[in-house]
Amino acid sequence: MTAIRYEFIKTCKQTGARLGRVHTPHGSFDTPTFMPVGTLATVKTMSPEELKAMDSGIILSNTYHLWLRPGHEIIREAGGLHKFMNWDRAILTDSGGFQVFSLSDFRRIEEEGVHFRNHLNGDKLFLSPEKAMEIQNALGSDIMMAFDECPPFPATFEYMKKSVERTSRWAERCLKAHERPQDQGLFGIVQGGEFEELRRQSAKDLVSMDFPGYAVGGLSVGEPKDIMNRVLEFTTPLLPDNKPRYLMGVGSPDSLIDGAIRGIDMFDCVLPTRIARNGTCMTSEGRLVVKNAKFARDFGPLDPNCDCYTCKNYSRAYIRHLMKCDETFGIRLTSYHNLHFLLNLMEQVRQAIREDRLGDFREEFFEQYGFNKPNAKNF
């Protein structure tokens, strides 16, 4: 019995998006879904109870950051990440690869792994497929990710080809080193940049290894949205229908809908909590920056069409006041709202798939949110 099982429910006749359910050792969640990011074993400013109140079935934590602080051995001693952070639903941990490539000024890639400097204190560190598995096995997440190379955008075909080949070899080493396949599902990560030939090669390599799920990596790294959509169009059909598909690092509302239309089941991104900290809110009528002076006497909710805790209880004027005074409660309220907005958006996406009208929903949402306007903002 594998730790992770994907249950297919139906396909949207209008778009081909799929409705499903992922079963894990810590419960099930419906897909397509958005996963809030709890980098350091906490979704910034949110309690586990609040995440449950907004119906989050799975969150993401970060292997690299937890390895550095507090250390995976301490989390193992605590009884694993679920106990450590008091979260009894599913957890996905990334492999640490993206952080090694994005945070460290100094890094040297070898066949064995990656040498780099700790971004906190400059110490020399080494992360390999085996080490990434050891850390994630200690954390005890339900879904763990293979250690991959995260190439920059843009990269040459030659560089990307070598990178894909290395990522495939590393994936094989991850499978061998993974010590808890019965209660932790390991996902392979398809790379290859914008090159269809390399995506095909990467998918073929990984599918032959029979992972319980697959991620599409190397997107949302600065490439235009049309390139991301094009890559998804030729990549997701290469992945098995009976396994979950995860698009890493994507969280803007338009990309969530467009990803679901292209067959993606799972998404994660720090976007909702990151922008909340500077007062930027996603609403049914588009982006709203609550710090702006025009909201000083606005006693209506952030979003008149939202029924979240923030919108039911607090006004734009009050939240603006908190943000201007650097009060933590202001960040909690905007973070709660943004997370609720995306989780609720995914429920609307699932309902549209049930009704075979996701294409129509996309048009309506884009029109209302303002994505169809010239110079539309990303979120």
Swiss-Prot record:
Note accompanying the cofactor annotation: Binds 1 zinc ion per subunit.
GO molecular function: metal ion binding; tRNA-guanosine(34) queuine transglycosylase activity
Keywords linked to the UniProt accession: Glycosyltransferase, Metal-binding, Queuosine biosynthesis, Transferase, tRNA processing, Zinc
GO process annotations (BP): queuosine biosynthetic process; tRNA wobble guanine modification; tRNA-guanine transglycosylation
Chain sites annotated for binding Zn(2+): C306, C308, C311, H337
InterPro entries recorded: ArchSynthase1/Queuine_TRR (IPR050076), TGT (IPR004803), TGT-like_sf (IPR036511), tRNA_ribo_trans-like (IPR002616)
Pathway: tRNA modification; tRNA-queuosine biosynthesis
Catalytic machinery residues: D94 (proton acceptor), D268 (nucleophile)
Uppermost EC category: transferase
Pfam families recorded: TGT (PF01702)
Keyword Transferase attached: yes
Cofactor field: Zn(2+)
The keyword Oxidoreductase belongs to this UniProt entry's keyword annotation: no
Recorded catalytic activity of this chain's protein: 7-aminomethyl-7-carbaguanine + guanosine(34) in tRNA = 7-aminomethyl-7-carbaguanosine(34) in tRNA + guanine
Coiled coil start-end: none
EC code(s) of this entry: 2.4.2.29
Gene3D superfamilies named among the record's database cross-references: Queuine tRNA-ribosyltransferase-like
Annotated binding of substrate, by residue: D94, S95, G96, G97, F98, D148, Q191, G218
Ranges for region RNA binding: 249-255, 273-277
NCBIfam families per UniProt: Q_tRNA_tgt, tgt_general
HAMAP family, A to Z: Q_tRNA_Tgt
Summary of the function given for this chain in its UniProt record: Catalyzes the base-exchange of a guanine (G) residue with the queuine precursor 7-aminomethyl-7-deazaguanine (PreQ1) at position 34 (anticodon wobble position) in tRNAs with GU(N) anticodons (tRNA-Asp, -Asn, -His and -Tyr). Catalysis occurs through a double-displacement mechanism. The nucleophile active site attacks the C1' of nucleotide 34 to detach the guanine base from the RNA, forming a covalent enzyme-RNA intermediate. The proton acceptor active site deprotonates the incoming PreQ1, allowing a nucleophilic attack on the C1' of the ribose to form the product.
Subunit composition and interactions: Homodimer. Within each dimer, one monomer is responsible for RNA recognition and catalysis, while the other monomer binds to the replacement base PreQ1.
Assigned protein family: Belongs to the queuine tRNA-ribosyltransferase family.
PANTHER family hit by this protein: QUEUINE TRNA-RIBOSYLTRANSFERASE
Protein name per its UniProtKB record: Queuine tRNA-ribosyltransferase
Lineage: Bacteria, Bacillati, Bacillota, Bacilli, Bacillales
